[in-house]
Amino acid sequence: MKKTAISLMLAALLPAMNAYAEQGDWVVRLRATNISPNESSDLGKYVNKNVANVMSNGAELKLDNNTIPELDISYYWTKNIATELILALGSKHDVSVAKEPGSVVPNQKLGSIDALPPTLTVQWHFNPDQTFDPYVGAGINATFMLDRTLTLNQSSVGALQGSKIKIDRDSFGPALQAGLDVNLKDGWLLNADVKYLWIDTDVKLRNPLAGNSWTKIDSLDVNPWVISLGIGKRF
């Protein structure tokens, strides 16, 4: 009788147990994602060399952070191996000219750009049949510059003031990823995820000193950290 009661209790608990990953599963996640550029820029050096000596050599381009909604879809080839496609909406970033570190001169805004950064990664899940499932991943990122025109509006640049600047090309590069799924009941899960994306592009100026031809004024590495928190559903 006692064994029967225990069996009935276990059977009653089974439907409430957490759902874990299996081969052939699809997972859809909705996350809040912060994109934090880790940029590297030599704007001042390029402008002074290629256009005119009107900037400090330490001047550089800076992009601000942005938080956006992000949808991703994963497919499990095995219970450990999954492919994830990140479908973030366009991310808008203000672009400014910054002086040398420690300068009292404030950053001077040039405008904003919109970037669309879909990313495809292959993941290894360490504990797919447990509540806490950490994973790592690697893949490729494609960043498409949707709104890429800026204006050099500083009076200190003389004849270059008012000149148009453009982000010249889209970017394709590697991506690394680490994260954690917390498996809940009925296929639901919580997710925390960190990515590092290699994004590089050229920046050009419509040069009034050279017949308004486009002149390269920077080789910009954006290289953002992408940090996400959200929920997901397994199907």
Q: Can you name each region flagged by the protein language model?
A:
Residues 36-67, 88-117, 143-171, 199-226:
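Extracellular/periplasm-exposed beta-strand and loop segments of Gram-negative cell-envelope proteins
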Residues 30, 71-75, 85, 120-124, ...:
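Residues on the lipid-exposed face of transmembrane beta-strands in outer-membrane beta-barrel proteins
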Residues 17-21:
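Sec/Tat signal peptide C-region and signal peptidase I cleavage site
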Residues 7-15:
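Bacterial N-terminal signal peptides
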